[in-house]
Curated annotation (Swiss-Prot):
Swiss-Prot/TrEMBL keywords: Cell membrane, Glycoprotein, Membrane, Transmembrane, Transmembrane helix
Positions glycosylated per UniProt: 141
Cellular component, GO, one term: plasma membrane
Source species of the chain: Selaginella moellendorffii
Protein name per its UniProtKB record: CASP-like protein UU1
C-alpha cells in the first residue's frame, strides 16, 4: 500500500497551460527592476539638471532665454519622471509588469510622452551648450569659472537624463509592440 502511494506521488499532473512557465517569469522579472531603475535615474538626473540651471538662471537675472527653456523642460521632465516612477513602483508592488494590467491607451501615451521628453531634453541641453560656447561664458582664459562649471554640470546632467529617457523609450516601445501584437 505504501508503494502505491509513492508511485502516485511520482507522477504529478501535467503543467497547466494557464500557469506561466519559469522561463517566461524570468523574462518578465528582469524588466521590472530595469524600468524602475531607469525612472529613478530620469528623476534624479533631471532634478539635478534643472536645479543647477535654476540657480544659474537666478545668478544671471533671467536674461538668457535658453536657460529659462532648459529650466522649464527640466521641471516638466522631472515631474513626468516622478509620475512614471510612482506608477512603475505601484506595478512592481502589486506584482504586475508595466506591460500587463494597463490599457493599450496607457502604453501609447507612455511611449509618446517618453519620446517627447527625450527630444525636449536633448534640445534644451543642446541649446544651453551652444549658448555657453557661443556667448563665451567659458572663456579660454578661465574667466567665468564658477558660471562655466555650473552650466557645464547642468548640461551634463541634462544629457544623462536624456540617456535615461532614451533607454526608457526603448523599453516602453518594446512594451507597446508587445501590447499591439497581443491584441
Amino acid at each position: 500500500m505504501e508503494e502505491s502511494q509513492q508511485q502516485s506521488t511520482k507522477f504529478d499532473a501535467p503543467p497547466s497551460p494557464y500557469v506561466p512557465s519559469r522561463v517566461y517569469l524570468a523574462q518578465i522579472y528582469w524588466k521590472k527592476p530595469a524600468i524602475v531603475v531607469l525612472r529613478v535615474l530620469q528623476f534624479v538626473f533631471s532634478l539635478i539638471a534643472f536645479s543647477v540651471m535654476a540657480d544659474l538662471l537666478h545668478d544671471v537675472q533671467g536674461s538668457i532665454k535658453s536657460l529659462s527653456y532648459t529650466v522649464a523642460i527640466g521641471v516638466l521632465a522631472c515631474a513626468y519622471a516622478l509620475a512614471q516612477l510612482s506608477f512603475s513602483l505601484w506595478c512592481v508592488i502589486r506584482g504586475a509588469t508595466s506591460s500587463s494590467g494597463v490599457t493599450p491607451l496607457y502604453q501609447y501615451a507612455t511611449f509618446i510622452c517618453d519620446q517627447m521628453s527625450t527630444y525636449f531634453l536633448i534640445s534644451a541641453a543642446s541649446a544651453t551648450a551652444t549658448l555657453i560656447d557661443v556667448s563665451g561664458v567659458c572663456g579660454s582664459n578661465g574667466s567665468g569659472t564658477n558660471l562655466c562649471s555650473r552650466s557645464t554640470a547642468s548640461v551634463t546632467f541634462a544629457f544623462l537624463a536624456f540617456l535615461a529617457f532614451s533607454a526608457s523609450s526603448v523599453l516602453t516601445g518594446y512594451y507597446l509592440v508587445k501590447c499591439i501584437l497581443k491584441a
